[in-house]
Amino acid sequence: MLIGVGTDIVQIPRIEKILHLYPELFAKKILASKELKQFALLGKINHAAFLAKRFAAKEAVSKAFGVGIGQGINFKDITILNNDLGKPIVEVSSNYTNTLSPFNIHLSLADDYPVCVAFAVIESSYNVILG
């Protein structure tokens, strides 16, 4: 059963400006601990694109849940990692998911300066009603 679909587009220059003003604060605000470790390993030239993709991905996932960021789910409740082939893997905090049946989140990310886009689909094998 389809639970929801979400998409988001982020202007990478917007994230560059935020990073210039708040170099550490912004990353700590939107990244979960596992993502912060990945972020620390990147060269500074890749920071804005990484953050833009994570921001867009988390917005898309929250929209697919039908709630949006700050309305039942927060940036740090969603972790975006990559498998060995680079496929995005989504982990959602048990604080949010413990009331839901098992589900799968499919996420696609793309960036081509100056934009990045995220598209999320959430599905379940059970009948679930959100909201």
Swiss-Prot record:
Mg(2+) binds at D8, E59. Keywords: Cytoplasm, Fatty acid biosynthesis, Fatty acid metabolism, Lipid biosynthesis, Lipid metabolism, Magnesium, Metal-binding, Transferase. GO terms for molecular function: holo-[acyl-carrier-protein] synthase activity; magnesium ion binding. Coiled coil: none annotated. Its EC number is 2.7.8.7. Pfam families: ACPS. Its main location: cytoplasm. The keyword Transferase applies. Its cofactor is Mg(2+). Belongs to the P-Pant transferase superfamily. AcpS family. Transfers the 4'-phosphopantetheine moiety from coenzyme A to a Ser of acyl-carrier-protein. This is Holo-[acyl-carrier-protein] synthase. It comes from Rickettsia africae (strain ESF-5).
